[in-house]
Regions:
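Short, non-ligating residues that shape and space the ligands of small metal-coordination modules
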Residues: 95-98, 109-111
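Short cysteine-rich clusters marking metal-coordination/redox-active sites
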Residues: 89, 101-104
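Cys/His-enriched microdomains
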Residues: 84-87, 99
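Glycine/proline-rich active-site loop of Rossmann-fold NAD(P)-dependent oxidoreductases
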Residues: 71
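Flexible, glycine/small-residue-enriched loop-and-beta-strand segment within the central core
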Residues: 1-54, 86-87
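Short metal-binding segments enriched for Cys and/or His
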Residues: 111-119
């Protein structure tokens, strides 16, 4: 209830989505809160996504992470609670917080809200 999953999303095994901000055992007056997972996002195994948050396009959530806030496009978040630890391109290239590839050292930048390699 209240979960919106867009196209090309990866959801790993045992991912948990909550849908009530204040769950109580005998609460008949609960309020379901919507969560949206945008196109191309990836959520690692055993992650927990708390109600009312949005996972941006092509964002990645590390395995076992607990997401307590909205995640932006192409952002990489890991940990409990999840913390912003870098970026990831639409093609899956991991970048540090300065938008530099951890593997090749190439620099990337956001151009018209799209993450692209600098020429």
């Amino acid at each position: 209830d209240g979960l919106i999953i867009k196209d090309d999303v990866f959801i790993g095994p045992n991912v948990t989505f909550t849908n009530d901000m204040n769950p109580r055992s005998k609460n008949v007056d609960y309020n379901l809160v919507s969560t949206t997972i945008k196109k191309g996002a990836s959520i690692g195994a055993n992650a927990t996504i708390l109600a009312g948050n949005e996972i941006g396009e092509y964002a990645m959530i590390g395995a076992g992470s607990v997401v307590t806030k909205t995640i932006g496009k192409n952002e990489l978040w890991v940990g409990n609670p999840a913390k912003h630890s870098g970026y990831i391109t639409n093609e899956g290239v991991l970048l540090d917080m300065n938008l530099v590839s951890k593997e090749t050292g190439k620099q990337y930048a956001f151009l018209n809200s799209e993450l692209r390699e600098n020429d």
